[in-house]
Amino acid sequence: GIGGLPMIEATDGDYRERGPRRISPFFVPASIINMISGHLSIKYGLKGPNLAIVTACATGLHCIGAAGRLIEYGDADVMIAGGAEATVTPMTMAGFASMTALSERNDTPETASRPFDLTRDGFVLGEGGGILVLEEYEHAKARGAKIYCELVGQGLSSDGYHIAAPDPSGAG
């Protein structure tokens, strides 16, 4: 969703403490989220569409949907798609806390995450990732691949309500 935030924070500390000459020449490329897919492309010789999407918590799902559409449109036979996030840092926690976006159920963390409950009071920040290999159906059949599921569609929407809060009615 954010991409490279821990490195950005660490590099900012280096800059402030040791000056601009101590900044790694890899800082900018490493902070750009599409560099992960670029490195995979170079390492494994992958050719074809290569892009990165940033849509906060929905990034991984939107990447999978976009990959499915590229296959559907005939732009690729196989796509690697998904997302990963590792931004539990002091600055991230402070930012979400200042928005009052984090759950305050600190005494009962096992019940703090309840996104669809009427008594929800925020979210629980976490880290994780998930990657899928998507393949055009006939292409997979031709090579004898075991097919686990079929992606038949995806919906994208914005509720046009608030910068961080969902529309209470669920519209959008």
Kindly give the residue locations of the regions a language model identified.
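Fold-level recognition of mixed alpha/beta catalytic cores in primary-metabolism enzymes, strongest
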Residues: A84-T87, M93-A101
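Condensing-enzyme catalytic core mediating Claisen C-C bond formation in acyl metabolism
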Residues: D107-G172
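Short, intrinsically disordered, charge-balanced linker/junction segments flanking boundaries
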Residues: G1-I2, R16, P168-G172
